[in-house]
C-alpha cells in the first residue's frame, strides 16, 4: 500500500483565480515530486469544508469503478494518463501527473495558455477525433480535467465521465446525487420523459454552450464540435 500521508491536496483554480476543490467524487493528492496523483474516492470533509452536496458513498464507488475501467480500456490513447496502481480496498487510483492542470495556466494572472502550450487547440481537436474514432463521449471537460505531460502531451483525467456510445441512455436517478445547480440545466434538457439522460444531447450542450459560459471563456470547443462532429 502506498503511503500518501505526506502528499498535498490538489486544488483547481476557478476563473476568478481562487483555489477550490476540483470535484465532488474523489480527493486528489499529489506526491512531493508532483509526478503522481492519487484519486482517493472517499467522502473527505477536510478537502471540501464548505461543500453542501454530499454524494452518497455508493455513487462514489460507482464512479470509482468507471474511472478504473476507462483508464484501462483507453490506455492506448495518448491522452490517457499512465495508470500506475489501483488500491481497490481503499478506492485509490494512482496515475501520471505533472504539477498542475490547465486551470492553473488559464486562471493565474500573467500566464497564457497559447504562449505556454502553442498547440493546445490542435491537441484538443486530436483528442476529440480519438473519442469519435473510439465511440465514446467524455463529458467532464473543464480546464482542471486536463494537464500537459512532461513531454508536452495533453492528458485528460476524470475518466469516470467517459460515456461509450452503447451507454448513450443512462437512468438519471442513478447519478442524481452528483448533479449540482450550476450544470443542472444540461441534465434537464437531456432527460427524456422516461427519466433517462441522453448523453449524446448532453455532450452537445456541454461542448457548444456550457464550457464557453462556465469555464474556458472561449469558443474553442464549439468550433471543434463543428469540425469533428458535423463533418
Residue positions per predicted region:
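Conserved hydrophobic "DFG−1" position in protein kinase catalytic cores
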Residues: 28, 95-97, 147-149
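Catalytic-loop of the protein kinase fold
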Residues: 132-148
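ATP-binding glycine-rich loop module of kinase domains
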Residues: 10-12, 21-70
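C-lobe/activation-segment region of protein kinase-like
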Residues: 149-231
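Juxta-kinase regulatory segment immediately upstream of eukaryotic protein kinase catalytic domains
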Residues: 1-20
Amino acid at each position: 500500500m502506498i503511503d500518501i500521508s505526506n502528499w498535498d491536496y490538489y486544488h483547481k483554480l476557478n476563473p476568478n483565480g481562487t483555489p477550490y476543490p476540483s470535484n465532488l467524487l474523489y480527493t486528489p493528492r499529489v506526491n512531493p515530486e508532483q509526478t503522481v496523483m492519487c484519486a482517493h474516492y472517499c467522502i473527505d470533509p477536510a478537502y471540501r469544508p464548505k461543500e453542501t452536496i454530499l454524494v452518497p458513498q455508493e455513487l462514489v464507488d460507482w464512479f470509482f469503478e468507471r474511472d478504473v475501467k476507462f483508464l484501462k480500456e483507453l490506455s492506448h490513447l495518448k491522452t490517457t494518463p499512465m495508470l500506475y496502481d489501483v488500491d481497490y480496498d481503499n478506492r485509490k487510483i494512482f496515475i501520471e501527473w505533472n504539477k498542475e492542470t490547465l486551470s492553473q495556466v488559464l486562471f493565474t494572472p500573467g500566464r497564457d495558455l497559447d504562449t505556454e502550450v502553442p498547440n493546445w487547440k490542435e491537441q484538443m481537436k486530436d483528442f476529440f477525433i480519438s473519442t469519435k474514432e473510439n465511440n465514446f463521449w467524455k463529458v467532464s471537460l473543464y480546464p482542471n480535467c486536463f494537464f500537459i505531460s512532461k513531454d508536452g502531451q495533453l492528458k485528460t483525467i476524470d475518466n469516470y465521465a467517459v460515456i461509450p456510445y452503447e451507454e448513450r441512455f443512462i437512468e438519471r436517478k442513478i447519478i442524481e446525487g452528483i448533479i449540482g445547480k450550476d450544470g443542472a440545466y444540461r441534465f434537464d434538457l437531456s432527460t427524456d420523459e422516461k427519466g433517462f439522460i441522453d448523453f449524446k444531447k448532453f455532450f452537445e450542450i456541454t461542448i457548444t454552450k456550457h464550457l464557453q459560459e462556465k469555464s474556458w471563456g472561449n469558443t474553442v470547443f464549439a468550433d471543434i464540435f463543428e469540425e469533428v462532429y458535423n463533418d
